[in-house]
Amino acid sequence: CTMNNHNFGCDFGSYHLKIYHRDADAYLIQHNMVAVQDKKGLLAFGDEAYAMYEKAPSNIQVTSPMSYGNLASISNMQAFLRNLLERNIKGQLKGAEYFVALPTEMQERIFTTLIQDSNMKPKGVYLVDKPVAAGLGLGINVKEAQGVMLVDIGAETTEISVLSLGGIVISRLIQNGGRSIDDAIQSAIRKEYNFFIGSKTAETIKKELAYAVEPEQASMQICGRNMVIGLPQMMEVTSDFVYEAIKEQLGIIMDAVKTILERTPPELGVDIIRNGIYLTGGSARIHKLDQLLEQKSGIRVIVDEEPETSVVRGLARVMGDREFRSLAFVTKEQKYE
C-alpha cells in the first residue's frame, strides 16, 4: 500500500504564515516571526516568538523571515516551516506536495528553492499567483473571461491586480500596508504628545480606532513612555486623532488603485464597474475603508468576511478542485514527473 502523502497550501505573509493542510482540512495560522538566540539558534517561532517581540534582551533577535513581500532570511523561514509542520503534523513530511502563493514581483525560484533545500524532501512545489489565489478564496471563478479587480492590503505591501482568464492582466505592489499605517499612528503620537508607544500598541489602536472616513466618536487608554519625564504613563487617544494620523497612508493606497484603474483596458474596466472591486488582506478590516475606496473610485466595493485568509482559502480550492488545478505551475527549471 502507498503512504498517503501530505498536501500543504502556504501563504508566506510578512505578518502571518498561513498553511492549509489538505489531509486534515485544517488551517495553521501563526505570526511569521522567529526568535533567534546568539550562539544557540532558533529559540521560538510563530505566536510564541511574537509574544517576545519588543520585549527581548539584546542576545535574542526577534524578526520576521519575510520583509516587504520578499524573503529576508531563507534559513529562518526554513527552520520555522519545518518546525511548525513537525510540531503539528503526524507522520512523515517526506514526499509532501506544496502549493505556494507567489506575490507579484517575487522571483519564482525563491519559494521553490526554500522548500526543496529544506531537507523536508518534498515530492513537488507548485506556485499559484497570489492575486489569483485571493480571487479564488473570495469565491470568484477567476478562469472566466471577466475582469476582476482585487486590492489586497497586507502587513507590509498592498497588491493591486486585475485578473481575467486565470491570469494577471495588470498588477502592482506598493510598499505600504498595515505596518506603515501603524507607523503613522506611532509617529503622530510621538510628534503631538511627546509620547512613545510600541508597534504592538499602535496596531491595537488601529484595530480599535482607525476609520477611513467620518470617524465615530471613540477613544481608548494606551500605555507608553512620556518622553519629557522619561517614565511609563497612560494617556487617552481618540478616533479623530487616529483618522488624521492615517489619512496620508490610506491616500497613497487609494492613489495606487486609481493608477491601476487608469491603466486597465476598457473592456475589462466595464467588467470591474459591473462586478465591483474586491478588498482583502488584514487591513481590509479598517473601519469604513470600503466607503473610502468607493468614494475615490466611484465603483462599489466588496469586502471579504475573513480578509486575512482569502489567499490560503484560494490555495485550498486549487488543491481540492480539479477545475482550478491548472492555475498552479512549476518554476521553469523544475519538472515533476
Each language-model region and where it sits:
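Nucleotide/phosphate-binding catalytic cleft detector across ATP-hydrolyzing
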Residues: 1-150, 163-277, 284-311, 316-337
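A structural feature that tracks compact, well-ordered secondary-structure segments
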Residues: 159-161
